[in-house]
Amino acid sequence: LILFTIRIPDHAILILSKDKKKFKPKLIIIEIKNQNVSGSVDEKLWAGIAIKKNYQYWLENFDIEYVFILSTYLYNLVIGNKKKYNGLSKLLSDSNIKIFYGNDINHFENIYNLIINNSK
């Protein structure tokens, strides 16, 4: 895909259907973000909405699913009460951007289920 010369995600999973009338190909983009103290990585979470739209623009023949896997610090920011992040969780949810906690004991199972559920 030519877009990957512009953007290189941490992981990309392409799901094809034998029945092309059933649904168009799906591309799951997985971005892993790690931050342990305040800094600039958290800004990439806000940018996720625009980045997903960029993928949708360039890959209009694909369904795009965008996922963040977050470190403990970032995950707590997104689900916490800090004023700066009050709307972030809602904006990501409204944009259908999923958030996974990287240290979750079921981390790999959650990703596996995401792939399986998108393969149906």
State the predicted function of each range.
Residues 5-6, 32, 38-43, 54-58, ...:
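Catalytic phosphate/metal-binding cores of nucleic-acid and nucleotide-processing enzymes, i.e., regions
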